[in-house]
């Protein structure tokens, strides 16, 4: 009989203090006989999120799968009230509703996504449930919320007082234009490689602040906000989703790596594909982050200000990406 072990909730330390109990359902039974030490666990995330990458890295060290670790890692930012572009406290749409989007993709190419979900904080976890517990890939709106409640997620008001105050200030003018690198964070996209050498990822966001109600960007769209091919590598996107969708950016990057491009070369080409459709310096930001199966990293953005966090050998490092402008 193969040895199996449970990952104890308390073993995640800081995560245990800040993330709801529902999240710890990701610490599933681990088949320890399949765990090897040949691959050093690897975590890569958009923006400066050292707590999230450390939580994911700690989980990987304990044998958690790359998918479970990435969902657990981004859950920290979904709970983090200081991040107003993800989860609880996320900026609302123009009607004052916080609507969340997320997707996940594992090493087998299986994926799940949720769009325009209200009152459910941990939407990356919900996307994983869509992947694992339904015959579908995407659930949206009230249907996704209903499914979440059936799975044990607790509905809650995600509009914080600070987000509400900012929204009311915006209402006085009503001007709508995406802010570049607002507070130096945006969509949280995370890529993990586990001890078995498998690559998976998760992507979560509250979308553009003061968007039209029902707007969905790239984050929950497989191939745009996130794409994984376990034989090649993975990529995630951040920034103005409409521009990412038009070139199916994350899929493009992985396909370029399949053709022999390095992660850096692939990210640069994906940004250039966007810029070819615009004259001069654009007034929006898009950033891409990618890795191949060897752990080589690529990152590139339209304008400066995009950064990423890398955790390897238990060390976090935040790096500013190169950019066109």
Model feature map: region roles:
Residues 23, 27-28:
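Binding-site signature for planar aromatic cofactors or substrates
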Residues 16-22:
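Hydrophobic h-region of N-terminal signal peptides that target proteins for export
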Residues 4-5, 21, 75:
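Solvent-exposed, well-ordered amphipathic alpha-helical segments
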């Amino acid at each position: 009989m193969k040895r199996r072990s449970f990952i104890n909730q308390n073993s995640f330390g800081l995560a245990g203090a800040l993330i709801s109990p529902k999240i710890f359902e990701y610490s599933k039974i681990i088949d320890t006989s399949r765990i090897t030490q040949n691959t050093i666990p690897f975590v890569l995330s958009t923006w400066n999120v050292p707590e999230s990458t450390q939580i994911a890295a700690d989980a990987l060290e304990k044998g958690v799968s790359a998918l479970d670790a990435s969902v657990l890692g981004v859950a920290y930012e979904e709970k983090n009230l200081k991040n107003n572009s993800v989860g609880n406290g996320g900026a609302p749409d123009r009607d004052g509703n916080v609507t969340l989007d997320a997707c996940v993709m594992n090493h087998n190419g299986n994926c799940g996504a949720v769009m325009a979900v209200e009152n459910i904080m941990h939407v990356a976890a919900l996307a994983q449930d869509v992947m694992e517990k339904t015959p579908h890939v995407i659930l949206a709106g009230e249907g996704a919320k209903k499914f979440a409640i059936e799975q044990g997620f607790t509905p809650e008001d995600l509009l914080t007082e600070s987000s509400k105050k900012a929204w009311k200030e915006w209402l006085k003018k009503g001007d709508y234009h995406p802010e570049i690198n607002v507070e130096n964070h945006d969509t949280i996209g995370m890529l993990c490689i586990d001890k078995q050498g498998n690559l998976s990822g998760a992507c979560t966001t509250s979308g553009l602040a003061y968007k039209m109600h029902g707007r969905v960007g790239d984050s929950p769209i497989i191939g745009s906000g996130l794409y994984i091919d376990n034989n090649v590598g993975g990529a995630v996107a951040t920034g103005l989703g409409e521009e990412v969708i038009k070139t199916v950016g994350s899929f493009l990057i992985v396909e370029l790596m399949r053709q022999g491009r390095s992660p850096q070369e692939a990210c640069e080409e994906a940004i250039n594909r966007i810029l070819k459709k615009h004259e001069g310096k654009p007034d929006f930001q898009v950033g891409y982050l990618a890795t191949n199966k060897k752990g080589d990293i690529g990152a590139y953005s339209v304008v400066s200000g995009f950064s990423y966090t890398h955790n390897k050998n238990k060390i976090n490092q935040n790096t500013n990406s190169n950019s066109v402008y």
